[in-house]
């Protein structure tokens, strides 16, 4: 009688199979729909091909395109299909590496000449032939020296180097599809025919192993999906991302710009700085209502402060240093050490806690020039930064309040988010009981508010557990924005204490928190999320008044003055241009309201209202328009153009 294996599925059910059955065969017995969708699997948590055999009792998870790891396998096979096509068209090409990415993939090639757009079209056509052929993809484990001989005989020098880098205790494996063989740990799809929809996107330069001293390679990017519709949707989002790019919209809308004289530092223009101040002042009011004390601490600080905090030893490479009068200083990369100094400046009682210190001052960190990316990755920035000094028994309550503040800000802006709870790492510092209670307090706060969250075991900082809030924008991209970080170590390093009810000194817990995070980055995200169609309340220019002819300038000036006096950000366009031209320009600048004034409007004390993204609202008494605008500003509502942009839908 043949042996059997017991396989536990994710739902807890246990199935019995003959020993040695392939995963593909086992999945077929579970159901035809799952068998058709299956891409790869995890056996006892290890990624494997569907051709792998079940030799002992185990857990089994079938991966489909709905799973992140399933998509990675799908796109990893896509890189091999692309590499096979390149080798067919360019036999002299040398293969290096080709990993999957979140929504795409790439492969680096050593080629004698640059690839052209026409070359990409030919590669795509050849890939289609490989998919049509539906070659089985076969895994083979080989001897290390045999693998080196195999690739050396074919002139694949980079692959020989890669074999040498495989640890001695790891298996060397190759994958073959048709005439093509590549060194790869896998897993892969069962056959090339599974990749039905793909597109090559671009070619860029890349260096072998990322070292500029090495030869430059050609990196071909592509993407792939299970269906043509999913591919089309992704390509639409990709084009939308280009159209919404804040690095283009910022200068076009007169918000900000970057100059070579200050790489990584934004030059804020008048309109952009208005938007910046609106967000900052809104945040300030929300924090004042919750008992925060706003401070301003020095921008340049002695290295001695950072020696105490530990940043000089562990973060110095990311700081801008200054040497003056035989002393070392640095521009401030974060506010927490200075806030510790303020806390320690006087004796604190348990009644003084929680003490909430907020600051919006300038910060700077050194980032390599190659990593800078508009407002999203800068060297100079500001944060809606705050530090809460609390008793251990106050942690849960204060975390709830911070999450409530996140809700208020993100909810108003129409941003959805996911929460990650990162717990104690192996190299944690401090008392394990305090860690356990802090992690439990974070979890209780989330559970008590009915929040779902993802647990990241061991991913916390060494000095405390944390919550990360990942925002999803209109194009489905995720951005880590808000952070709530517990810190047990800085209070120790700065010897921070408070006098408890028992009259003895106790150590406070420090909570680092930022809601928007870096304001520069947050504005970059919002610019792309709204495609420049900012809600009325934060729009740099809320209305533009357009006189039809010169004789209407006086009335237009009266309208501008009255609206500005009422607190609206309004400007007039008095240029000697046709009104249609001025309307079109105001629309391109995404101004929420366009107010046209002529004889009828001047006589009636009215304005002809055009709303962004909508048809004309028609003539309206000026007082009625003002009431409409003020109501929308007070409620922080979004107009149709703003809502549509934030939804990411096609026109």
Curated annotation (Swiss-Prot):
It catalyses: tRNA(Thr) + L-threonine + ATP = L-threonyl-tRNA(Thr) + AMP + diphosphate + H(+). It is found in: Cytoplasm. The keyword Metal-binding applies. It holds the Pfam family HGTP_anticodon. GO terms for cellular component: cytoplasm. It is an enzyme of class 6 (ligase). Keywords: Aminoacyl-tRNA synthetase, ATP-binding, Cytoplasm, Ligase, Metal-binding, Nucleotide-binding, Protein biosynthesis, RNA-binding, tRNA-binding, Zinc. One of its GO terms (biological process) is threonyl-tRNA aminoacylation. Coiled coil: none annotated. Binds 1 zinc ion per subunit. GO terms for molecular function: ATP binding; catalytic activity, acting on a protein; metal ion binding; threonine-tRNA ligase activity; transferase activity; tRNA binding. Residues 1-64 form the TGS domain. The keyword Ligase applies. Belongs to the class-II aminoacyl-tRNA synthetase family. Homodimer. PANTHER family: THREONINE--TRNA LIGASE, CHLOROPLASTIC_MITOCHONDRIAL 2 (PTHR11451:SF44), THREONINE-TRNA LIGASE (PTHR11451). Catalyzes the attachment of threonine to tRNA(Thr) in a two-step reaction: L-threonine is first activated by ATP to form Thr-AMP and then transferred to the acceptor end of tRNA(Thr). Also edits incorrectly charged L-seryl-tRNA(Thr). This is Threonine--tRNA ligase. It comes from Symbiobacterium thermophilum (strain DSM 24528 / JCM 14929 / IAM 14863 / T). The gene is thrS.
């Amino acid at each position: 009688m043949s042996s059997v294996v017991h396989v536990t599925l994710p739902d807890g059910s246990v199935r019995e199979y003959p020993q040695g059955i392939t995963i593909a065969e086992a999945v077929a017995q579970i159901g035809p729909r799952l068998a058709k969708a299956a891409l790869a699997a995890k056996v006892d948590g290890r990624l494997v091909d569907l051709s792998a055999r079940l030799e002992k009792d185990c857990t089994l998870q079938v991966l489909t395109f709905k799973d992140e790891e399933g998509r990675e396998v799908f796109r990893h096979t896509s890189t091999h299909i692309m590499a096979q096509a390149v080798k067919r068209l360019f036999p002299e090409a040398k293969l290096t590496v080709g990993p999957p990415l979140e929504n795409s993939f790439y492969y680096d090639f050593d080629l004698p000449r640059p690839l052209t757009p026409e070359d990409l079209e030919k590669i795509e056509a050849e890939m289609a032939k490989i998919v049509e052929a539906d070659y089985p993809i076969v895994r083979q484990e080989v001897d290390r020296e045999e693998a080196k001989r195999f690739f050396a005989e074919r002139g694949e020098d980079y692959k020989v180097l890669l074999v040498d880098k495989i640890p001695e205790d790891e298996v060397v494996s190759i994958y073959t599809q048709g005439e093509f063989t590549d060194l790869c740990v896998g897993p892969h799809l069962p056959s090339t025919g599974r990749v039905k929809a793909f597109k090559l996107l671009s070619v860029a330069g890349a260096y072998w192993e990322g070292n500029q001293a090495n030869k430059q390679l050609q990196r071909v990017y592509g993407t792939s999906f299970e269906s043509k519709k999913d591919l089309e949707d992704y390509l639409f989002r990709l084009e939308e991302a280009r159209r919404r790019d804040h690095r283009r919209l910022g200068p076009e809308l007169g918000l900000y710009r970057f100059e070579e004289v200050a790489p990584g530092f934004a030059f804020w223009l008048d309109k952009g700085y208005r938007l910046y101040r609106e967000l900052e002042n809104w945040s300030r009011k929300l924090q004042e209502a919750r008992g925060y004390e706003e401070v301003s601490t020095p921008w340049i600080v002695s290295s001695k402060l950072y020696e105490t905090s530990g940043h000089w030893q562990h973060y110095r490479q990311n700081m801008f240093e200054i040497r003056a009068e035989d002393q070392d200083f640095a521009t401030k990369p974060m506010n927490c050490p200075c806030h510790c100094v303020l806390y320690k400046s006087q004796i604190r009682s348990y009644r003084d806690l929680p003490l909430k210190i907020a600051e919006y001052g300038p910060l700077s960190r050194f980032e390599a020039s190659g990593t800078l990316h508009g407002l999203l990755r800068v060297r100079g920035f500001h944060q809606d930064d705050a530090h809460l000094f609390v008793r251990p028994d106050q942690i849960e309550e204060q975390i709830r309040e911070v999450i409530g503040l996140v809700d208020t800000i993100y909810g108003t802006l129409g941003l959805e988010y996911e929460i990650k709870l990162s717990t104690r790492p192996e190299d944690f510092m401090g008392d394990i009981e305090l860690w356990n209670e802090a992690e439990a307090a974070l979890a209780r706060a989330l559970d008590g508010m009915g929040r779902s969250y993802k647990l990241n075991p061991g991913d916390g900082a060494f000095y405390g557990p944390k919550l990360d809030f990942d925002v999803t924008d209109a194009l489905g991209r995720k951005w880590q924005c808000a952070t709530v970080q517990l810190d047990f170590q800085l209070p120790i390093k700065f010897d921070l204490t408070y006098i408890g009810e028992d009259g003895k000194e106790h150590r406070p817990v420090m909570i680092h928190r930022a809601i928007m995070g870096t304001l520069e980055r947050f504005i970059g995200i919002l610019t792309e999320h709204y495609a420049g169609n900012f809600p009325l309340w934060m729009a740099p220019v809320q209305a533009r008044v357009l006189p039809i002819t010169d004789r209407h300038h006086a009335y237009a000036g009266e309208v501008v003055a009255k609206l500005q006096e009422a607190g609206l950000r309004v400007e007039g366009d008095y240029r000697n241009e046709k009104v249609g031209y001025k309307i079109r320009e105001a629309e391109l600048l995404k101004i929420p309201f366009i107010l046209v004034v002529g004889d009828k409007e001047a006589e009636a004390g009215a304005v002809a209202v055009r709303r962004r993204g909508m048809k004309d609202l028609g003539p309206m008494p000026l007082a009625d328009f003002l009431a409409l605008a003020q109501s929308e500003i007070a409620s922080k509502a979004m107009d149709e153009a703003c809502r549509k942009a934030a939804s990411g839908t096609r026109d």
